[in-house]
Structures are given as C-alpha cells and as structure tokens.
C-alpha cells in the first residue's frame, strides 16, 4: 500500500503550504517506505509515499502525462492495466511500467468518465494543470482508505489516513467508496452502482457452484500481479484457505506473461498467527500441508497483544471493538511478514459479507432479508474489515489484496439467488463456496464452522480484553461517558477503553465521526437485530454470542 496526501484549491502557493503537505505525508510514510515524491504547481500540491509492488524501478509517483500537464497520485493496484495499455498502444506514450499510469491515459481519452473501465483497488487524486481542475476517486467497496477535508479559506485536503489530516485542516470526513469528486461539479458523486443491490433483481436468478469457482479463481489470478515477493494470510478458516489454495495453483508461473515464464518466487509462503493452541493455528497447519505452502506460524501472548493496543489503535484509526480485537494479531503478524521480505499478501476478507457467513445469518427469516443484509454489510465494509486489513498491514509497509471483493467477482457472487446462500437452523454457512472448493481443501477445513478471526486466534484473547478493560474503566466513568464522549457514546467498558486511547491520538470531532457505532451481534448491522429476540439485549461482536449455533457459545 502507498500513501497519498495533499492540498487542492490553493489560491497562492507558498513554502508554508508545501511544508505542510510534506508533514502530512510524513505522517503516513509507514504506508510507503520505499520512496517519497511531491508535486507543487497551479492550485495543487500532491504528495506520495510509495510501496513499490509493480515496476519498482520506474514507477515512482506522482505520475505525469507525456506533456506533464496532468499529474496523478495513486494508492492502489489496477489489475487490468495490461489490457488498458494494449488498447492505448500507439495512442498514448506511457512513461513508466506502473499499473496506475493507465488512469492518465483513460483521462486523456474520456475525461472523468472512465472509472468503470478500471478493475482494481484504488484511491487517487488527478490534477489537470492545463484546466486547473482535479478529480478524486475511490474504489467500489473502499478497500483503499481515503479521507477529504477543508479549511476556512476553502482549500481542500486529502489523505490516506486520519493522521494525515488531523490538526492540518479544520474538518474532514470519509471519502465514500464508489464515489468521485470533480472540482468542476463541486461535490461528491456516486460512480459505482449495481442492480444486484435490489432483491427484485436477483430473486429468480440461478446459483451455480461452477460460476463461483471460475469467478473466484479468475479474481485471485488477476490479483497475483507483482514484481516483488508475495504470500497469503492463512488463518485456517474457509475463506483464507480457499484463497491460499487458488494462489498456490497459480504461484509457479508468472501471470504477467500469461504463464509463459516461471514465477520469480515460485514457492508460496503462508502466514498464521494465534495464541498457543488456538483453533486457527491447528487448521492452518492442515491446510498448508495439504496445498504445499511454506508455512510460518507465529505465536503471540495475550500480554504482547495488550502491549500493542495503543499502537494498534493509532495505526488502524478506530475504536470499534471487533476491529480493535481482530487488528491486534494482524498488526503483530504484519511485522513478521515484512521482516521476511514479503511486501504483498492475499487475504480472505469479504466472503462473510458476500455469502452471509457470519453466524447470525442463520437467523435470517427470508431470502430477501438475507440478501438485503449482505448488501448493507458490503456498503459498510470500508469502516470494518477493509479498514482492518489495510491499515493493520500497511502499518508495517505490507499491501493486502482481497479477491472476494474483486469487482468482477462481486458481479457474479451478488447476483446469485439468495436462497442458495441461506443457512437456516444448523445448516452450514457458505455452502456454495464449500462445494465449489471442497476438492482443494482438507475436509476438516472445507466444512469447518465459521470462526471470526478475533475468536480463532484464541478464545482467551477476547476474554482477557473484556476482563482488562472492565477493570480499567470505573463505573463512575461509564456513568459520565456521555459527557466525555457525546459523539458515539461508549455502551460498555471495552468500548470506553478503546475510545479513550483513540481520543489521545485523534481528539477532533471529525475523527470521532469517522468511526461507526451501532448495536451489533457477531458483526451484524443494527437492522438484523430484529431477526431474533435473543439479539435485542446483546451488544457483542464475537461469534460466540450466537447461542444455539456457535459450538463454543457464551452461556
């Protein structure tokens, strides 16, 4: 992952503004430790911190058009860049081998109306010096983070993380996924829209296992483009195991040559983390042996996790309970991954949102309710699992890719008949995924019950967090929580504890408002609480909150 930051709509360029932009970028240098670049001109300053994945030698940013009249800062990966390059061969004089440079070619040809042509994950700012206009855009689901702010003088600020904006502008907010901001229009607009968000569109559709298998294998294959060593996150759960097995299938050949040459790093490395004896570690070992990866198992202690909490909250920029719980082991794991020279990993985020894999989906009363909840979950994912995976890894300069959220794959998976995804009663969740890839996995994993990452790393991790935070926050503090935190007032002591640390790092109201705060059972939306009367008095994101479904449920 790279980092971008900068200032737009500048009336008069000054040294002070350039220095400010540099300081903003320095705050997110962990995202791009390989190189720094800055553009100052017209009414814009664009700064870039680079993590080199594709074309490490010549792909530095900001990127420029051949006449240097357009400049681009991108955090992202454009998976179909080779197809776009081929389309513009002889029509556009590419300056680098960077996958992101195709954005400039598309802009030259189509103006701002090209975002649907891109397959990838991205957040970018394009400044047209000739027209003195700019375009900001973010990928469909929000895999890549982006924030936008302003000051009293009308200048516009942007940054990959809160820390690039906190204290630098007067207010800021999340730049919404699937949206763009064109300076000529002056407001954020949606560019990504799909019919499958409506139940009426999908209710009579087919649901073929083979379609899921082909589409996901193609997504993984697309996302293996890399000029640096890569690996897979292998928790031992279904989702990461499927991604790992597919990646192993293609790892021996270089996809940039369509398999015509051997891969530069043909041996696939897999990574798992947990407390000693954790459920995930046992299953991850089984999968690694079955598919043949070089497996790395990292043990951490509860105390090591507790010691990292303050840093974790600083890097992930949230006080959401389930995100903090799950981000801590991922943050620790990312440090080890980077120490081994790995810069990119594939991960299994998104499957539970797309296929209704969380255990509360067992309670969905109708196919329509099930489908509408998956759509809601996808629309909010940028504040939860996308944020966790991106920021936990980028804290150590590691890029995460998520094939289950691939744009083309979503158009297949979200168009499936919701009846085929449902899991009433004790029926296993994500059956269609299990059936599609059962032959590629050990049976014990292919049919393993859903285990949330923060649970699977070891049940004592969450149990200790609840105990520690209960002791650290007094009843009196909870009584006055609304006075101290009027925005998203903490509802329990664990929330209060994380919120207190967050406020130390990010004291502004703008920061507080970027974090979601809604009642939830095992990661549900607030709307899904109506599915079961037992949910209504619970506010616990762990999968063990779903009594009668989880095999180790709270009693």
Where are these predicted regions, by residue range?
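Short, hydrophobic alpha-helix immediately C-terminal to the catalytic nucleophile
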Residues: 104-105, 241-245, 331-335, 356, ...
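Adenosyl-5′-phosphate
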Residues: 1, 339-346, 365, 370-555
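Short acidic/histidine-rich active-site segments
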Residues: 342-352, 358
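Cysteine-centered catalytic environments shared across enzyme families
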Residues: 1-319
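ATP-dependent adenylate-handling ligase core
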Residues: 273-334, 360-369, 391-392, 415-423, ...
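Short, basic, helix/turn surface patches
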Residues: 125, 321-331, 375-378, 474-479
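Hydrophobic (often cysteine-bearing) scaffold residues that line and stabilize catalytic clefts
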Residues: 17, 96-99, 118, 205-212, ...
């Amino acid at each position: 992952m790279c980092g971008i930051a900068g200032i737009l709509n500048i009336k008069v360029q000054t040294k002070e503004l350039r220095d400010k932009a540099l300081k903003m970028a320095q705050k997110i240098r962990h995202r791009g430790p390989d190189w720094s670049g800055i553009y100052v001109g017209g009414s814009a300053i664009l700064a870039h911190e680079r993590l080199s994945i594709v074309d490490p030698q010549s792909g530095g940013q900001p990127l420029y058009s051949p006449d240097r009249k357009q400049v681009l800062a991108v955090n992202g990966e454009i998976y179909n860049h080779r197809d776009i390059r081929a389309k513009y061969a002889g029509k556009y004089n590419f300056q680098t081998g960077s996958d992101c440079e195709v954005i400039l070619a598309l802009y030259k040809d189509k103006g701002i109306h090209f975002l649907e042509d891109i397959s990838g994950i991205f957040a970018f700012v394009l400044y047209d010096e000739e027209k003195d206009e700019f375009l900001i855009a973010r990928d469909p689901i929000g895999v890549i983070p982006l924030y936008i702010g302003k000051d009293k003088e009308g200048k516009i600020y942007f940054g990959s993380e809160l820390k690039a904006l906190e204290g630098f502008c007067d207010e800021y907010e999340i730049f919404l996924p699937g949206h763009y901001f064109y300076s000529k229009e002056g407001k954020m607009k949606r560019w990504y829209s799909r019919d499958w968000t409506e139940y009426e569109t999908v209710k009579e559709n087919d649901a073929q296992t083979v379609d899921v298998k082909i589409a996901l294998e193609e997504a993984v294959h697309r996302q293996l483009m890399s000029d640096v060593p890569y690996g897979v996150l292998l928790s031992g759960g279904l989702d990461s195991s499927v991604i790992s097995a597919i990646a192993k299938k293609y790892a021996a050949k270089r996809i940039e040559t369509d398999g015509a040459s051997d891969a530069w790093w043909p041996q696939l490395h897999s990574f798992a983390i947990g407390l000693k004896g954790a459920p995930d570690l046992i299953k991850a070992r089984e999968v690694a042996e079955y598919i043949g990866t070089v497996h790395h198992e990292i043990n951490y202690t509860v105390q090591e996790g507790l010691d990292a909490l303050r840093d974790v909250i600083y890097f992930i920029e949230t006080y959401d309970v389930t995100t903090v719980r799950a981000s801590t082991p991922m943050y620790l794991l990312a440090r080890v991954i980077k120490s081994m020279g790995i810069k990119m990993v594939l991960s299994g985020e998104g499957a539970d949102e797309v296929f209704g894999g969380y255990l509360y989906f067992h309670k969905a009363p109708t196919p329509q309710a099930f489908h509408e909840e998956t759509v809601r979950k996808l629309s909010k994912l940028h504040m939860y699992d996308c944020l966790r995976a991106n920021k936990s890894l980028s804290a150590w300069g590691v890029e995460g890719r998520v094939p289950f959220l691939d744009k083309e794959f979503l158009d297949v998976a979200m168009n499936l008949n919701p009846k085929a995804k449902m899991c009433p009663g004790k029926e296993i969740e994500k059956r269609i995924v299990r059936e599609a890839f059962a032959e590629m996995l050990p049976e014990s994993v292919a049919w393993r019950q859903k285990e949330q990452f923060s649970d699977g790393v070891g049940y004592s991790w969450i149990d200790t967090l609840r105990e520690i935070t209960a002791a650290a926050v007094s009843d009196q503090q909870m009584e006055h929580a609304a006075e101290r935190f009027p925005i998203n007032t903490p509802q329990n002591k664990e929330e209060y504890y994380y919120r207190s640390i967050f406020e130390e790092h990010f004291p502004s109201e703008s920061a507080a408002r970027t974090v979601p705060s809604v009642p939830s059972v095992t990661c549900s939306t607030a709307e899904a609480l109506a599915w079961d009367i037992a949910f209504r008095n619970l506010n616990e994101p762990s999968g063990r909150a779903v009594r009668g479904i989880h095999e180790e449920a709270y009693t």
